[in-house]
Each structure stands twice: as C-alpha cells, then as structure tokens.
C-alpha cells in the first residue's frame, strides 16, 4: 500500500517549502468526559484558558453568536431558530448517557454512550445504530447520543486548547490554525444535514451473500444541526493553487492511529471543485445540535460534506492537504466503493479493482425505508381497527442536494402504486440544495393490508432517480437501495381475534429475525444447486472435503443428527452427544448453526483438537434465488386467505423462548452475602415475563471480556415462577488468591465489577436434566423416578440442587424426600445456608441437610474433612432401583473420587442412578 500522507513531500512553490511538518502532539490532559462532553463553547474557552484578554473573549463569543450581518442573514435564511426548537424537542425525553460496562477494558472506557445503541461490531471499536423505532420517535433532528457511529478504532482523546489543523500542500500560505483561531477568524454557518453510512441496509445484502462488511440495519442514518467554518473560506485564506498549478484534490486526515495498510491514519479526499463550491456547504464542524462535538462524533472538529456518504467526513481532523492526486490513505481506496457484482475479494485484490476511480462513492443515492409498522408489530383485525385507515410511515433521502419529490407504496408487488404525503422540514440553501431526509406517510385500508402479501416503498428525486426493484449485491455491501419490503402474515393473537404481523427484511447486527433470514433457511441444498459460491470463512474451496450449504447444515439440528459449524468447518456431533461433559443440550442449543464464537468462548485447546475427529466437510453458500412465497395471503378473496392462520395459543409470557437467542437483562440489584459471594438480580426484558427455565436446567451468561466472548453456566436461585427478574448467587474468584488460578474467575470478577444498570446477555435453557415434579425426571429425554433423592453438592454446585429443592417444597403434593450433603472448604464458603436451614426446619420430614467442611472452626457440629463412605451411609438413603436417585454437582475430583466409588458401595448404579449436572 502507498505510504500515508504523513510522508509526502511537495516541491518548493514561489519560495515556500511544502514538506510536511508533524503536528504537535495533543496534551496528555484528555478532554474531561464528565465535565466537558456537552458543555457549550464559551464555557470551554473560559475553563481551558484559551483566551486571556476580555477583548479577545468578546471577539470569540461574538463570532460564536453569529453577530456579523452576513451570518445573521444566512441563519435567518436557513431557519436556524426553528431547528434549535426541534433540537430541544428531540432531547426532551432522552435519558442520560453512561459509561457503558461494555466499554470497560477498551481504549474507549472514558466515553459516555447511550445504552440503547445497537452495537454492530461487538465490544470494540464502537459501531452502532439506534433501534429504528427509537430513531423515528425523536423526529427530524436526531439526539446526539442516538446518532449512528462509525469508528474504525479507538477514539482519540482530544484537548480543545492545544488542538490545531494544518493546511498544507499546494497552497501559497501554509498555515496551522488552533480552534480559537478557527472560530474567531472565520465566519460560521449552521444548518441541518442528514448523515448516512454507505453501508446503511447492508444486512439485506449479507442475507443474500456475505459481503466484507458488518451488518448495518436501516438506521445507519441520522440528522443533526451542524455548525462550522466553510472549508472554502479556509482554503481561500491559505491561497489554494489553481488546477493549472496542480491543485486537483483536497485531502483530509484524522488523528486516530489505525492498522489498515500496515498502520495509517484515516484519510480521504474530494475534488477541489467540490471543496471550493459554496453551493455544497462543506464545513469544518465544531458543534452538533447546539453543543460541542462529542468524542464519538469527532471532537473537537470534523468535516461535514452534505449530500455525501459519511466516509468522506473525516472526524478528529488534523490535516488538510491540497494535492494533484487523490488521497493515498489505505481507507480511501479499501473502503467506500461499489464494485461490480462479479468482483469478489480475491479478484478485487489481484486485479486492483480498488483503484479504479469509477467505483468510488461520493454522493448518496436515492433511498427510502418503511419504519411503521415496526418489525413483529401486530395489527389486530376487529370492528374498531377496520373502521379507520392504518398509516404507513417512513423516511427517504437522496444525495447531492437533490430534493426527494415523490415516495410511492405498493401493496401488490409493484403492479400499482400509491403516492405518499411528504413532510419536508428543511428549507433549501440559497442555491436550492436539500441536505436532509424527509418523512413520508400513507393511509391505507386495513382490509387492503390483510389481502397484501407484502408492502414495498420506493422514492424519487428531482432528477427522476428511483430505487431498483431487486437487490444488487456488491463486495462491500454498500449503497443498497432496492425497494424496502415488509412481509405480512395473518396470525391469531391469544385474545382470539385475527391480526396482521409485519416482518422487516432483517434486524441489525447479529440479531435474529426478518423475512430474509427465513428465506435463507429455505434455500435449496447444494446438491441440487448449480451455482456454488465460495464461503466467506473458507476463501479457497477444499475439493478434497465434502461441501455443504448453510441450508443443508440447518436441517441437522436434532439429537438424531446434530451438526455444527466452527470456523467454516462442518462437524457431525451426533455420536458425541451422550459423552459431552456439558450434556446434550449444550450441543443441541447450537445444532444446525455457526457457533464459532460460542465454541471458542468455553472450550480448551484439548477440546478443539478432539473436535477434529467429528469433521465431515466444509461450508459453502449457494446462489440466492427468491424463495417460494411463504406468505399465507392470496389476493383474490378472503376464503383461502384465512385458511392457514396460525393459532397463537394462550401462554405465559416467558423470556427463554428460543434457546439459541441471547436475551438482554439489566442489573437492578447487587447484594454482598459475604466477602466473595454476591447475589445479582437482573431485570428481564419485560416486567410481566417469567424466565421460563425448566427445573434442573441452567442458563449461559454471556459477556464480552477483554475483547472475547465469555460464556459461563449458572443456575438461577430465583423462584421458578418469579416474574420480571432472575437471581444469580455467584462466588467471586478474585485474582491473586488461589496460586493455581492467579487470574481468578473471569466471569465472576466481571459480574462483580458491573454497576447497577449494566446489561448482560443470557441464553438457554440448557442442561440434560429436568425435574418434572413428584419424583419424575427427564434425563436426556429418558424418564426416571425416585421417592428419595440423595443430593450431593460441592461449593457453587449447590445452585441446581437448591433449584430442585425449591421446586419440590413449593408443591404441597410432592412428597419426594431429599437428603442433602453439602461440601465446602470452610464454613464461610457455604452458600444459601440461611435458606437451606430455614426449609429444613420447616419441612423436617422431607428435607435433611448435612455439611462437610475441609477446615472447621471450634464448635463445628457437622463433618470435617471430605465426603467419605461413612458420611454418605449416615446421611443419604441406600441405592434401591425405583426408590432412590443421586443428584450431584461439584468439582470433578469430588464426583470421581468421593462420590462414584462410595455410591457404588451403597448399591447405586452410577451409570443410571447418578445424575450429574
């Protein structure tokens, strides 16, 4: 890759040397996140003592207040007071940003962010969009914390007082301006601009064939009121050369250090004619929605190029270089291109497609999206709803300053179209340019929606550009602007009435759902498809291995045939189910899916080597064809239309509906039971939800720790029928306590560090043991029964035992007898002791408890040492077939050396009668 612009040297022109001088290193005193993220400019100037004299302060504030007559006229023409009112309205119901626990242990841990933002690239770097309903709720102006973010790496820690921008290259008067000089010496402009990531709606492309980009949904778009200095004024001050003098491009370079091309800054460029065109309103912005920029959006200064993709708007701007050539930044060439559909990554690199100028993206294309109805929204069909129309809503935008002139909606696949009502809240600039999105709406009859199989939207701009019907795939997944379609299906909600449920094409990030995901599941298998493509995870097809499509793998998701994908390889784990230490559910929960991340999170190197014995082939993908119509709708009459309605039977609202989906939960209470034991209470997504965890099963707690997914199994201690929350009792294994484990417990320490309000994910249920009540168990699907239970636990292994005790005692008709032997290192290590002894005291005939500790205090009245045959014979029943079962959860040495041999001596068949969690 070419060297970065840092290393460029320019010839002397008119006696001025233009070799690059490195910019000053910003002060290590970083911009204080707590005090300065949202302060107004005059406060910052005062506190950082940028200016010393009253006269200078007055000049700065006057410039900030737009006191010049030209600026006043411009502000009046742009309707700035109206936009400022919209900013206030938009921010009125916005919760404060927080230091998100997900940013701990990253370089961005100092940045406050809105916790509702959907992260698209994991923990770091921060790339995020707002939930679509949330974005639309705030209206024309997007609150800054909900504005989409595209970061390539860590956010630079900037200081207003020592930040400067260097203007160099083909200019007569190279200069370096501080922030104070920029705002005091140049006029400013303030107007709204809609920013759009070129990857907006990319996940739809990834559903067809994986691109090299991550999964943007349809909220990679936001609108703010931006204030800054016109770029043309700065270049004019510095004496930019003419085209004849070689000044053809204006390059921008940011401050962040990135890995691309072996190490570089983020940089890009635009043509000189664009940079100098006053009609284009290009500014160096230092304010957003009336406040200084926040770190994620480029504090202290960034480029705003209205009507262009976000990739041209360099944040944390440090240098402007006027050159004959385009920017030679790695990111200028290896990003923001729309290559022909035939070009894959290998071809793009080998044939230098990245460097062909005709494929660079600058101006946005025309686009529109349906935002109402939302995904999974249900419209009831009844006497009330059918008496009034339903209002479809959405947004539309175009690029280059072109006005969106028409939005149309079709309910019949494009045979007929209805023209929507447009809401343009923006006044054009004096050159007639429009830089913002507009909103559209259309009233439709509910019965027309009932007979439609889908709803699609397309927009037109003043140049009569419109959106294509079908998706056009490209390697980077950019500029996707095909008709936005939502599918409709008839359902029957639990109240018994008919309803229409709406499905958007995708959901952002790694969230499951959307009709395109369903279509992908219905792809024909690789054996009958002639159009085989290379897998993203296996760039070169291995002809020695059998190749399987994702749709073929998805069929193998049962105990009879359990396949998984790890790093693009296919493994048949069916014969390993019965031997898996974590039980069959741990495999079945991921059967038929790509579980690379989960597998890496919980398996050792030994397990990874063992997996190779089960490898059967490699993953491919198939060419995309539209699947058969799976809608229940027909358009002719309502007789066949309603025939296949799916009955949604009344059921409890439970969180763990799909064991493969992660459920976000929020920490609402943390109690210290002892120096190293905590009780955590997490709120479920809905206040009226039950967890839905069968007795005997457990959940995975999922967290990103040190940039890696970490999964740990926990059994909740909350009641099975608890509503709105889940309780976990966790022993915290601190680092530098146990010599064998100097780093301590990764997950337990992470949970202990979480502040109230933090979010984690859980998934489940999993586990091979389920207690069905009245002595009945299902073990890997096979029934077992006992009147008496020997319940043997070590350390934190008490939690699944606790769960079963709780369930049995909550049922007055369950007469199962329970005999608990609970081993720990010391008396202080005994978990949930108060609850256990309270139950034992209240239910003396049904529950008996005995403790064993390795180290005892004086006066200890239970056993000391380890679990022995004598302890077991005295405190649990003999092993009698059909009468007794042993349940065990604890360290492997306890089970292998203390329990199994001694239980055998007591008549237990350890293969059949010992149930190990």
Swiss-Prot record:
GO terms for cellular component: cytosol. The keyword Metal-binding applies. FAD binds at residues 712-715, 729-734, 741, 746-748, 799. Mo-molybdopterin binds at residue 197. Residues 660-772 form the FAD-binding FR-type domain. Root, leaf, and shoot. Heme binds at residues 580, 603. It comes from the Eukaryota. It is an enzyme of class 1 (oxidoreductase). Its EC number is 1.7.1.1. Keywords: Disulfide bond, FAD, Flavoprotein, Heme, Herbicide resistance, Iron, Metal-binding, Molybdenum, NAD, Nitrate assimilation, Oxidoreductase. Its cofactor is FAD; heme; Mo-molybdopterin. GO terms for biological process: nitrate assimilation; nitric oxide biosynthetic process; response to herbicide; response to light stimulus. Binds 1 FAD per subunit. It catalyses: nitrite + NAD(+) + H2O = nitrate + NADH + H(+). The keyword Cell membrane does not apply. Residues 62-81 are annotated as: Disordered. GO terms for molecular function: FAD binding; heme binding; molybdenum ion binding; molybdopterin cofactor binding; nitrate reductase (NADH) activity; nitrate reductase (NADPH) activity; nitrate reductase activity. InterPro entries: Cbr1-like_FAD-bd_dom, Cyt_B5-like_heme/steroid-bd, Cyt_B5-like_heme/steroid_sf, Cyt_B5_heme-BS, FAD-bd_FR_type, Flavoprot_Pyr_Nucl_cyt_Rdtase, FNR_nucleotide-bd, Ig_E-set. When mutated confers resistance to the herbicide chlorate. Belongs to the nitrate reductase family. Homodimer. Nitrate reductase is a key enzyme involved in the first step of nitrate assimilation in plants, fungi and bacteria. This is Nitrate reductase [NADH] 1. It comes from Arabidopsis thaliana (Mouse-ear cress).
